[in-house]
Amino acid sequence: MSGRDNRGAGGGGGGGGGGGHQPLSSAMGKLKEKLTRVGDELGYHRVESNLSTSNTATSLDTILPEDPFLFPQVSPQRHPQSTVRTQRLLEDEPPLSFRPLLEDDDINEPPTQQLTTQQQRTPLRASGSLELTPLPPPPTSLEIREHRDRQQRSAQVAAEELQRSKQSLKGSRVSFERRDTGNSNSNKQAESSDEDSFEERRTGFQQQKATSVDHKGILKDLKHILANDNRRQFQAKKHVSLDVKGTRFLQDLLKESSSEEEFHKTRREFQGRKHQSLDPRVTFKLDKVLQGSSTDSDEEGDDAEHKRLIHRPKDITKPVIIDLKDLESESDEDFHTSRQHFQQQRSISTDSRKSRRLYEMDEMGNKRGENIRHAVPFVRQITEDGKPKLEVYRPTTNPIFIWTQVLAALSVSLGSLVVGFVSAYTSPALVSMVDRNITSFEVTPQAASWVGGIMPLAGLAGGIAGGPFIEYLGRRNTILATAVPFIVSSLLIACAVNVAMVLAGRFLAGFCVGIASLSLPVYLGETVQPEVRGTLGLLPTAFGNIGILLCFVAGTYMDWSMLAFLGAALPVPFLVLMFLIPETPRWFVSRGREERARKALSWLRGKEADVEPELKGLMRSQADADRQGTQNTMLELLKRSNFKPLSISLGLMFFQQLSGINAVIFYTVSIFKDAGSTIDGNVCTIIVGVVNFLATFIATLLIDRAGRKILLYVSNIAMIITLFVLGGFFYCKAHGPDVSHLGWLPLSCFVIYILGFSLGFGPIPWLMMGEILPAKIRGSAASVATAFNWTCTFVVTKTFQDMIDVMGAHGAFWLFGAICFIGLFFVILYVPETQGKTLEDIERKMMGRVRRMSSVANIKPLSFNM
């Protein structure tokens, strides 16, 4: 300022004075203009009066800068050496101050920054006598730029806030164009975080478009979701991946999108790979994008195809539980690979009945083959305490018919072959045993009755003991422990010198049969994958029928002693193969041996298979069983949730044995003799055995396709018809016309009867015993069911001859037929279908821990650890 301080003083007296007052007039004009603008004309007149009465030639240019209104805007502060108070000017107009010329109350102090000691200037003395204190120095160019930048940023922030308010109302471009951007009520709703307001604004379009979210709106909602763990409510409104990692990936995509077009492009790409929608129409549109047909020209045809896929009854599939955390993968590529073939290419419906079958897709997203038969949709299921229970049982991509599972099934099935041989032994052996020309000791009819009836009684004892054995020794070790006693029992019979040794051998064999019949289905149920559990689970029954057939054929050529020696040789290969297979992974988990369980699963599923998801499911299931278990397991059987599956298993065992099957098997030769058939009795038994064997293999092909209940229906109807026809034949033979020319009829009825029994009621009760019984009571409940089965077997075989004596053969067959008729209604009303379901799914359904999705739509989800 020193260069401009005394522009009027540089000349001589009058000239200099005149030159100095011209800038004063200019400055006074500026002052008047500014003070008048703020409504303070009185202050101006006071300044003018003071100047006119003063005797000074000092120019105001020595005091004022050219533009004193560029001072930065700061909050006003009191000068430490001044008591002058100022009047605030407009926010965008910096004030002006004349400290020596104005009165204290005229105007307020200017909003300048407080001066430091160094910044304070000494009073200036001009040519006059009045001392003037100068104003602070003018702002630098840097301060001016900062001031203007702050103003620009404030304006930009205000514009962005207005833009966000507009964008929050825009769900799509169409809906945004139809709305009034100046609607203040809509702006208030956009700022609201209330769920009802959110639903009201978004429900009209949110689930109807494949890319139906605005750039900023979904980002805001994603932040809300990640902060509050409120994923379920968000999932019902917006199209976001079910896994946390996918949601974070979407958030990154949104942040990186620099324009709306780029946002829609990345959004479509993301949805095409990870989209999970509760609205099937949305996902179907995404399917079109994946398949390269994103145009709407064929929309009507697409809608018709979609309805056919969604609502066709044959496309009903089974529910499965999904663990959201387990769906996370190490990389986006892994995620894409593991999910694209079974998760992204079809609709997710809140009602499992409307979920369509999965399609096997190629890399381009096109349908490559037939429907994947065993694929399952992902449906949330709820536990009995009302909280979501999330477990993982994804459709496996591991090979199913691998040799290790087949080897395990064949190994235990050889034990079933021994069981079948031992069970059928009395039918051909008693014929030669009662012959004194062959046997060195006398076998009375009463003793012969006990030879046939003691084995079921011993099976009852073995069934009771088998429950604790499989729990404490393990499934495999229990089965293995029966091999040597089978050999010993057959040797006792083969070397018998009296009836007592025969009875002892039969009792020991029956005890082992009771244990084996309990442990074999449990072992297979816990080792074989659900997709083939029905097929491989029937192998023990098929091999049991082979044992029966082998006994009948060998009995035609051997006496009872040689037949027993053959029975002693059969357990040897069974004993060798049992050493090659592992214990069940489920039993290892129940004993806390996680590493052993992992090795067993790797052996059963293959070394290249991913067994971790299945192992986690087993561990969670065992943890639930441990939390709910009690010390007294037998008391657990009486609980309502456990008694239901147990009663179904007992009912199946009851109707299996009361169909009369064991009476027919044990007394086949005698029945054909009484019927007066022209066919040799031994030949008839061989024919019955062959039919029994073939029918079981037919059942193995049908059980995983037709289901358990369908085969039970067919089995019941076939047995009802043949038993009533047999009863009519024997009634006519005893009381009616001559039926000797119908000697073929008993054999035909027996063949159809055995065929029907072997299709359903023969193998399925044992298979379902290992499926429907809960894990925590499986050992004790299977023990009770097995003991009950052998009790019924003992009653039927021991009383069959007495029934014939009392009511005749026709009465006995009619009684069995009536029981089968009742059993048909039992199957219809109470027996569940277990085809293709995991043991955990079956257990939840049997124990009543599954609810419909519609009944739990408002249940708060589990928290996510992120």
UniProtKB/Swiss-Prot annotation:
Cellular localisation: Cell membrane
GO molecular function: sugar transmembrane transporter activity; trehalose transmembrane transporter activity
Any Pfam family matching the protein: Sugar_tr
Modified residues annotated as Phosphoserine in this record: S257, S258, S259, S329, S331, S854, S855
Keywords attached to this entry: Cell membrane, Glycoprotein, Membrane, Phosphoprotein, Sugar transport, Transmembrane, Transmembrane helix, Transport
Glycosylation sites: N437
Membrane topology: Multi-pass membrane protein
Composition bias, Polar residues: 74-86, 340-350
InterPro entries the UniProt entry points to: MFS_dom, MFS_ERD6/Tret1-like, MFS_sugar_transport-like, MFS_trans_sf, MFS_Trehalose_Transporter, Sugar/inositol_transpt, Sugar_transporter_CS
Region of interest (Disordered), ranges: 1-34, 67-212, 282-311, 335-357
Protein name: Facilitated trehalose transporter Tret1
Organism: Drosophila ananassae (Fruit fly)
